């Protein structure tokens, strides 16, 4: 059965189609906006002694491709500045920071994990009283989209969230979602609730399998180990998958990526400067090429 892209998924699919060219061009471009030039000049200040400086960035797995591309350009513009990236689920990264891992900049795929580390967040959000976030540096950096993907050549007839819900109710497919501590899993839980589906019952019936981060969910769909999975638009791009539907705000809310420098950052000023660079038009072009919306 030929899979059609729903109207909700059209913009994401269109962005995926043009993403490769933008990511390829990013590293070799010599053009620069005024804001990115200013940020680059500022970044050079901390590495002015000629010694190399390594920024440690903890970021949601869905940022792997874009941050690597942007960092390549940034390092070329700022000799001596290098990056050590830790890409994983936001829940895992939050735990590592809490346990004392060195981290200059944290970019989460959800507000929940950032709030848990931010003492200025509400008591409902900062349930453990943790104080790792430099609150003045915190910004909402990006918005992503939650999409439904199926393996290439699938004949299950899953072409929308509506049809997914019907198959889940019939218990005749295997569906993959993120764990409950992973933002994409939390968004998926909201989608299931939207359709009055009970995750625990579906899992007990053997209808659901899990991934520890969004990349694992994407891999299971790509390898046709499952009949469908919920991932981000950006991860659909990186895996070469075409989304068949896009979740609405009513289904799971907005997918906002907050970013903040950590209070115990080894290179706090340089981290702030790189975060400022991530908010330039130049960086936005890379983010938006794979389906993100720069905020």
Model features per residue range: what roles?
Residues 2-18:
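N-terminal secretory signal peptides and thylakoid transit peptides that target proteins
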Residues 20, 99-100, 223, 268:
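Alpha-helix termination/capping residues and helix-transition junctions
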Residues 23-25:
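C-terminal motif of bacterial Sec signal peptides marking the signal peptidase cleavage site
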Residues 28-29, 34, 38, 42-76, ...:
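Exported/periplasmic ABC-transporter solute-binding proteins
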Residues 90-131, 237-240:
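Pocket-flanking alpha-helical
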Residues 127, 132-141, 200-203:
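A short alpha-helix-loop-beta-strand transition element characteristic
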């Amino acid at each position: 059965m030929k899979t059609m892209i729903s109207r909700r998924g059209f913009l994401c699919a269109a962005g995926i189609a043009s993403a490769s060219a933008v990511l390829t061009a990013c590293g070799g471009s010599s053009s620069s906006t005024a804001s990115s030039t200013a940020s680059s000049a500022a970044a050079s200040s901390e590495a002015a002694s000629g010694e190399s400086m390594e920024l440690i960035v903890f970021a949601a797995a869905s940022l792997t491709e874009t941050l690597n591309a942007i960092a390549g350009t940034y390092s070329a513009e700022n000799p001596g500045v290098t990056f050590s990236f830790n890409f994983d689920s936001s829940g895992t990264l939050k735990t590592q920071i809490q346990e004392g891992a060195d981290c200059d900049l944290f970019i989460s795929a959800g507000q929940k994990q950032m709030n848990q580390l931010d003492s200025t967040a509400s008591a409902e959000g900062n349930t453990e009283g943790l104080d790792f976030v430099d609150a003045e540096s915190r910004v909402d950096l990006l918005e992503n989209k939650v999409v439904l993907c199926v393996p290439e050549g699938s004949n299950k007839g899953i072409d929308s969230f509506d049809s997914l819900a019907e198959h889940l109710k019939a218990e005749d497919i295997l569906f993959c979602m993120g764990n409950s501590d992973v933002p994409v899993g939390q968004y998926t839980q909201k989608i299931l609730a939207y359709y009055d589906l009970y995750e625990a019952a579906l899992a007990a019936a053997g209808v659901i399998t899990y991934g520890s981060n969004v990349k694992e969910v994407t891999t299971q769909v790509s390898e046709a180990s499952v009949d469908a999975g919920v991932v981000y638009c950006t991860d659909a791009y990186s895996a070469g998958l075409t989304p068949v539907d896009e979740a609405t705000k009513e289904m799971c809310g907005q997918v906002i990526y907050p970013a903040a420098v950590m209070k115990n950052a080894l290179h706090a000023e340089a981290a702030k400067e790189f975060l400022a660079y991530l908010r330039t038009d130049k960086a936005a072009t890379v983010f938006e090429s794979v389906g993100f919306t720069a905020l």
